[in-house]
């Protein structure tokens, strides 16, 4: 009967690990989206101030939105 308890404990640990991995992936996704939104806002602010877009921030945004980054979200 003791071995049944160990099996149940092992299954519970595996399920908990899977849940934490999924939560971590969602957390990273949300943080990346926040970073993208901050860069977009910075570009908008600079555009309003100067009347032109900042190339450095636009380039950084393009890197963040590259297809290889989007593949990691799925």
Swiss-Prot record:
For the Extracellular compartment, the record's topological domain ranges are 1-4
Identify the Gene3D superfamilies for this entry.
Answer: HIV-1 VPU cytoplasmic domain
Q: How is it modified after translation?
A: Phosphorylated by host CK2. This phosphorylation is necessary for interaction with human BTRC and degradation of CD4.
Quote one Gene Ontology molecular function term.
Answer: monoatomic cation channel activity
* Entry GO terms, CC: host cell membrane; membrane
Q: Which InterPro entries match?
A: Vpu, Vpu_cyt_dom_sf
Where does it localize? Answer: Host membrane
Keywords in alphabetical order, please: AIDS, Apoptosis, Host membrane, Host-virus interaction, Inhibition of host innate immune response by virus, Inhibition of host tetherin by virus, Ion channel, Ion transport, Membrane, Phosphoprotein, Transmembrane, Transmembrane helix, Transport, Viral immunoevasion
Q: Name one Pfam family in it.
A: Vpu
Q: Which SUPFAM superfamilies match?
A: HIV-1 VPU cytoplasmic domain (SSF57647)
Its domain of life?
A: Viruses
Instruction: List the transmembrane segments.
Output: 5-25
Activity: how regulated: Ion channel activity is inhibited by hexamethylene amiloride in vitro.
Query: What residues bear Phosphoserine in this entry?
Result: 54
The record comments on the domains as follows:
The N-terminus and transmembrane domains are required for self-oligomerization and proper virion budding, whereas the cytoplasmic domain is required for CD4 degradation. The cytoplasmic domain is composed of 2 amphipathic alpha helix that form a U-shape.
Q: What else is known?
A: HIV-1 lineages are divided in three main groups, M (for Major), O (for Outlier), and N (for New, or Non-M, Non-O). The vast majority of strains found worldwide belong to the group M. Group O seems to be endemic to and largely confined to Cameroon and neighboring countries in West Central Africa, where these viruses represent a small minority of HIV-1 strains. The group N is represented by a limited number of isolates from Cameroonian persons. The group M is further subdivided in 9 clades or subtypes (A to D, F to H, J and K).
| Subunit-structure text | Homopentamer. Interacts with host CD4 and BRTC; these interactions induce proteasomal degradation of CD4. Interacts with host BST2; this interaction leads to the degradation of host BST2. Interacts with host FBXW11. Interacts with host AP1M1; this interaction plays a role in the mistrafficking and subsequent degradation of host BST2. Interacts with host RANBP2; this interaction allows Vpu to down-regulate host BLM sumoylation.
* Protein name according to UniProt: Protein Vpu
What organism does the record attribute this protein to? Human immunodeficiency virus type 1 group N (isolate YBF106)
Q: Which classification does the entry list for the species?
A: Viruses, Riboviria, Pararnavirae, Artverviricota, Revtraviricetes
